[in-house]
């Protein structure tokens, strides 16, 4: 009975545009018996720029820069990098990666159109012309065996001094820096720039329930400023 009700509520939110507050509580049976899930660190835009500027300006370094830029701007999973293609006469970038939906028999995610969220340098947005560079087949680095792209990216970056510094910055906040931290940046920035959770979930290639379970923490990052604004006087009260 409970599973049926949960399924109905998820359907209403994911397919019928009901508000996210109707989602049932997320329960992961595996989490009860396994170790605590690590908290993924979202890279900031300034950290991404710092990292990219530190990578070597040579053939190999430029391939990895391109990969990092794509992951940050489009919110890619590392494995998405293998499955990129264009549609609509080259005007749209898509990922054809089909990821298993954990716990759901045989279900996988569908191909999705990718939407850029540009990295900012202060008040200016940086356009790295990623779609154009992909169209002319700018090379990406070797990503190893299928399903191991995250490990390949991590192996390369862990050798770099700036990445080690960023790891320490993440650990100081009780979080973990991984190859997915570029994707976490995308989610955090989408929330910060005012996109709706369902829009962000669709662009990242998962359903709203999964998104809320993984990224709801980014929805409350601006609590301090929100309460500061709420406590500002709206005007003088007449005596």
Can you annotate each of these PLM segments?
Residues 1-16, 27:
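Non-catalytic DNA-binding core/recognition domains of DNA-processing enzymes
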Residues 87-94, 195-214:
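Short, polar N-cap/turn motifs at the start of nucleic acid-interacting alpha helices
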Residues 69, 73, 180-206:
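C-terminal catalytic core of tyrosine-transesterase DNA break-rejoin enzymes
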Residues 229-239:
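Intrinsically disordered, low-complexity basic tails/linkers immediately adjacent to helix-turn-helix/homeobox/MYB/SANT
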Residues 42, 99-103, 204-228:
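Catalytic-site neighborhood detector that most strongly recognizes the C-terminal catalytic loop/helix
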Residues 114-175, 180-182, 186:
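Active-site/catalytic core of tyrosine-dependent DNA strand-transfer enzymes
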Residues 1-3, 21, 25-78, 82, ...:
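Basic, Lys/Arg- and aromatic-enriched nucleic-acid-binding interface segment
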Residues 83-127:
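Conserved tyrosine-mediated DNA breakage-rejoining catalytic core shared by Y-recombinases
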């Amino acid at each position: 009975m409970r599973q049926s009700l949960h399924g109905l509520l998820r359907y209403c939110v994911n397919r019928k545009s009901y508000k996210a507050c109707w989602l049932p509580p997320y329960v992961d049976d595996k989490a009860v018996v396994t170790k605590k899930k690590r908290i993924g660190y979202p890279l900031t835009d300034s950290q991404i720029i710092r990292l990219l500027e530190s990578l070597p300006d040579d053939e190999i370094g430029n391939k990895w820069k391109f990969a990092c830029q794509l992951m940050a701007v489009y919110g890619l999973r590392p494995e998405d990098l293998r499955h990129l293609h264009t549609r609509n006469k080259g005007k749209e970038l898509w990922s054809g990666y089909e990821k298993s939906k954990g716990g759901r028999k045989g279900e996988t995610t569908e191909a999705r159109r990718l939407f850029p969220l540009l990295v900012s340098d202060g008040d200016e947005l940086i356009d790295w012309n990623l779609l154009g560079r992909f169209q002319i087949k700018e090379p990406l680095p070797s990503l190893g065996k299928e399903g191991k792209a995250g490990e390949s990216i991590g192996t390369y970056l862990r050798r770099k001094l700036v990445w080690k510094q960023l790891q320490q910055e993440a650990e100081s906040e009780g979080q973990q820096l991984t190859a997915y931290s570029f994707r976490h940046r995308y989610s955090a920035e989408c929330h910060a720039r005012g996109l709706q959770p369902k829009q962000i979930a669709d662009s990242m290639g998962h359903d709203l329930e999964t998104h809320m379970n993984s990224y709801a923490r980014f929805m409350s990052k601006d609590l301090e400023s929100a309460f500061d604004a709420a406590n500002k006087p709206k005007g003088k009260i007449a005596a």
